[in-house]
């Protein structure tokens, strides 16, 4: 199994992991090293961009939300410096809009956290021609509406009044929706 994986990886097995969740980063780094990757890690957008500029890797796994900015900034630098880099974007916020944005900028795939090393490896090595199977449970209209509200809310820097204006709804209505669906 390990020999087959190294063969699939090719000559350049360099992998950049960018995530600000240190325990997750360490676990994933250890697991990916066992799978034959040669690792570099970064915990911020600035670190990730610096490594991408200096030593663009063959593979990259980038968290979407980092403390100092957006992981898509790292994806852009990786794409510029090494167009053949296979990039997987990870996020704890699985939304269609962010997945589309990540793929448009140049990500090869998009996974929701928590993703294990097998899922990440499969996404990094998957051939582009194979289409993923259709989802077993398609999103409901309520879920689509909620994700749209969340996307606009984040776009407005979590400003309820501005979000309500953009969504063409009363501020109190939006507050009730957010309160009802927020994690407790």
Swiss-Prot record:
Pfam families: Response_reg. GO terms for biological process: phosphorelay signal transduction system. Disulfide bonds: none annotated. The keyword Heme does not apply. GO terms for molecular function: DNA binding. Transmembrane segments: none annotated. Residues 14-128 form the Response regulatory domain. Keywords: Activator, DNA-binding, Phosphoprotein, Transcription, Transcription regulation, Two-component regulatory system. The keyword Cell membrane does not apply. Member of the two-component regulatory system RegB/RegA. Involved in transactivating anaerobic expression of the photosynthetic apparatus. It is a transcriptional regulator that is responsible for activating expression of the puf, puh, and puc operons in response to a decrease in oxygen tension. PANTHER family: PROTEIN PILG (PTHR44591:SF14), STRESS RESPONSE REGULATOR PROTEIN 1 (PTHR44591). This is Photosynthetic apparatus regulatory protein RegA. It comes from Cereibacter sphaeroides (strain ATCC 17023 / DSM 158 / JCM 6121 / CCUG 31486 / LMG 2827 / NBRC 12203 / NCIMB 8253 / ATH 2.4.1.) (Rhodobacter sphaeroides). The gene is regA.
